[in-house]
């Protein structure tokens, strides 16, 4: 939408990019994983031949045939994949969707990202979990193990003005939010998010 070539890349164990995007092409993320593990492939060429483009303009990799293949990627292999994606120069923006784990936050992989977006619905339960997470981040930062709080944003999804409440803690900044869209398809929800221009402040 802002004229930037954007890649959506998921390393979630059960992530399926094809739920959000559709595009032509016969290759999947399996081919990228094989190339990473073989260490013999020109990764820029592999990305160009494997990536698909949705009608929205977003680029993505179709999910592989087995979730275990993603789980099998080592931290070093994921790091090399991210570095190769950035070094390829193909994309202006890379959105990396990943499972939340403290192990991931402690990884030096977080040094490769410019912003970390955490999702919350603003409910009492969600806010309590969010607070516990951030308190743990603060402890790890004081121990010198990580330095990520300044990169963190909170994005509210399925937020209710009646029962939801914003999180106000530490250095975490609010990116914006969206209400629950009842009976809407995935594509309709994406269209509504785009209209909110939530992510523009990250592109400054």
Whereabouts are the PLM-identified features?
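Cytosolic-facing regulatory segments adjacent to core modules
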Residues: 39-55, 62-99
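Hydrophobic, Leu/Ile/Phe/Ala-enriched alpha-helical segments that form helix-helix packing faces
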Residues: 1-3, 82-89, 137-144, 200-203
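Phosphate-binding loop that captures ATP/GTP phosphates
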Residues: 2-60
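Conserved catalytic-core segment of NTP-binding enzymes
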Residues: 87-176
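Phosphate/oxyanion-binding active-site loops and adjacent basic polyanion-contact surfaces
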Residues: 74, 126-129, 195
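NTP-binding/hydrolysis catalytic cores, primarily Walker-type P-loop NTPases
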Residues: 182-204
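Short loop/turn segments at strand-loop or loop-helix junctions that form parts
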Residues: 11-12, 60-65, 121-122, 178-180
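A short acidic, often aromatic-flanked loop/helix-cap motif at beta-alpha or helix-coil junctions
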Residues: 68, 161-162, 179-189
């Amino acid at each position: 939408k802002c004229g930037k070539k954007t890649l959506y890349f998921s390393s979630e164990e059960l992530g399926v990019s094809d739920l959000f995007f559709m595009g032509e092409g016969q290759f999947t993320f399996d081919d990228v994983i094989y190339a990473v593990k073989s260490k013999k492939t020109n990764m820029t060429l592999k990305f160009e031949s494997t990536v698909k483009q949705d009608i929205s303009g977003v680029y993505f990799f179709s999910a592989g045939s087995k979730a275990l293949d993603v789980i099998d990627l080592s931290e070093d292999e994921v790091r090399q994949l991210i570095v190769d994606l950035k070094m390829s120069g193909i994309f202006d923006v890379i959105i990396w969707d990943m499972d939340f784990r403290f192990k991931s936050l402690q990884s030096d992989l977080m040094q490769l990202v410019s912003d970390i977006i955490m999702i919350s619905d603003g409910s009492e339960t969600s806010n309590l979990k969010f607070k516990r997470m951030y308190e743990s981040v603060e402890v790890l930062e004081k121990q010198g193990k990580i330095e990520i709080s300044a990169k963190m944003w909170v994005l509210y999804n399925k937020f209710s003005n009646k029962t939801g409440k914003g999180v106000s803690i530490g250095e975490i900044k609010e990116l914006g939010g969206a209400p629950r869209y009842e009976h809407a398809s995935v594509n309709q929800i994406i269209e509504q998010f785009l209209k909110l221009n939530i992510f523009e402040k990250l592109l400054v």
